[in-house]
């Protein structure tokens, strides 16, 4: 595979993209299908590194599943209860937060002796707030290296009860607790401390739990009530919707250099908050239309904006590079959690935007981008972060080529991203 990829200037973007399945939905659905009673067929499952890490972990834990040849359909035989390993295990989860956090919680239900570990970057991604909450519910968890970070040793013991969890760093901690709580012996009450970030991702979790037969009552996202002693039930067939974060690159490309691009697999009915990205493009001046299972974007005269994007942290990255093509500065606010993702995305984004000529102010939890009159050809570092690679592909929508280092890092969520982009592109 190429160590670098040079994208030549693109004159026009036009066409339709059938989106790969959502990463957030795929890994949640796999775990719930494994815990549920009955067999679940998951359709449009994402085939990517993060999903493979979840599948490998479930297999090691005794879950049986059958994958179609293209790995997008998966039949999972549910265990009808807890994940329990017969012997001590070590599970390697790469850099998949959507596997590490929910599994860390789910494995606390049984009596286990399991080590969860991953790539070096995973060991820099905080998990202390989740561990604190699980311990309040009786779980025995040890840090094997640095306090508050993986790798973890999990011995089980979670019973439920009254928990508090800090909501200000990652919504995945709450997601992990919510998915685990119905299988605990006792009822669980989860109180959120601080501002709950990425709230729409909690809606994805609640939607999936409901699909598997479990309802959660919450008081304005501040207190969540979950009955204990429940069993998830397979819905039979579950369709994974397209990945809205992945859609953002194609919609932005159309806003800059359309033509018109239609992304299918998400739309008006979508459970993913990242579909709100289309509203941001519309505010900037793009033309957007919605169907039940598609979003369409056409070019418009783009203006810079100043916006709180806490609700769409992943797609907000795409706005940072779209800003290179807008008239006037763009400010993206309330995105502190960029700093604890695949890399410190605030610092990485500021560094690479400056390389292509932008004037950038990097705050603790915001970024301000002033586009240059002319973009500069540059080699873009991707920091082993799939979204950095995809965001900076948009630079090629100018008169300037761009070189993306380590383009294969997109395998985390979208292995054939560059092929899909090329298919829609007319080269200048």
From Swiss-Prot:
The active site is at residue 314. Phosphoenolpyruvate binds at residues 23, 97, 125, 172, 345, 387, 412. Monomer. This is 3-phosphoshikimate 1-carboxyvinyltransferase. HAMAP family: EPSP_synth. 3-phosphoshikimate binds at residues 23-24, 28, 170-172, 198, 314, 337, 341. Belongs to the EPSP synthase family. It is an enzyme of class 2 (transferase).
């Amino acid at each position: 595979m190429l160590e670098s990829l040079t994208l030549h200037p693109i004159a026009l973007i036009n066409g339709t993209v059938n989106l790969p399945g959502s990463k957030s939905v795929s890994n949640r659905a796999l775990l719930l299908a494994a815990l549920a009673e009955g067999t679940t067929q998951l359709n449009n499952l994402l085939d990517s590194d993060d999903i493979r890490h979840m599948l490998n972990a479930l297999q090691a834990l005794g879950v049986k599943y059958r994958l179609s040849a293209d790995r997008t359909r998966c039949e999972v035989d549910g265990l009808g209860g807890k994940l329990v390993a017969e012997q001590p295990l070590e599970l390697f989860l790469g850099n998949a937060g959507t596997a590490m956090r929910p599994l860390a919680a789910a494995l606390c239900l049984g009596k286990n002796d399991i080590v969860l570990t991953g790539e070096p970057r995973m060991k820099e991604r905080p998990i202390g707030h989740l561990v604190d909450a699980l311990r309040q519910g009786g779980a025995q968890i040890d840090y094997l290296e640095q306090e508050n970070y993986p790798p973890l040793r999990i011995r089980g013991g979670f019973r439920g009860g009254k928990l508090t969890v800090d909501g200000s760093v990652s919504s995945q901690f709450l997601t992990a607790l919510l998915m685990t709580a119905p299988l605990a012996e006792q009822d669980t009450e989860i109180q959120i401390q601080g501002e709950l970030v990425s709230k729409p991702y909690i809606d994805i979790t609640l939607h999936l739990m409901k699909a598997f037969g479990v309802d959660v009552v919450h008081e304005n996202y501040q207190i969540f009530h979950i009955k204990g002693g429940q069993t998830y039930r397979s819905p039979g067939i579950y369709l994974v919707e397209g990945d809205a974060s992945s859609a953002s690159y194609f919609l932005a490309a159309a806003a800059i250099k359309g033509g018109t691009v239609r992304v299918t697999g998400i739309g008006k009915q979508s459970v993913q908050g990242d579909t709100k990205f289309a509203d941001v493009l519309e505010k900037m001046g793009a033309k957007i239309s919605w169907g039940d299972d598609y979003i369409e974007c056409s070019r418009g005269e783009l203006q810079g904006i100043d916006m709180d994007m806490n609700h769409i942290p992943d797609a907000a990255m795409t706005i940072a590079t779209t800003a290179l093509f807008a008239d006037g500065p763009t400010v993206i606010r309330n995105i502190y959690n960029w700093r604890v993702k695949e890399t410190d995305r605030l610092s990485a984004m500021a560094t690479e935007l400056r390389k292509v000529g932008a004037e950038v102010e990097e705050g603790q939890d915001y970024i301000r981008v002033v586009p240059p009159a002319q973009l500069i050809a540059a080699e873009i570092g991707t920091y082993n972060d799939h979204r950095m690679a995809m965001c900076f592909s948009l630079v090629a929508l100018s008169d300037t080529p761009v070189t993306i280092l380590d383009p294969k890092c997109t395998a985390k969520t979208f292995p054939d991203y560059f092929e899909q982009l090329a298919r829609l592109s007319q080269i200048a």
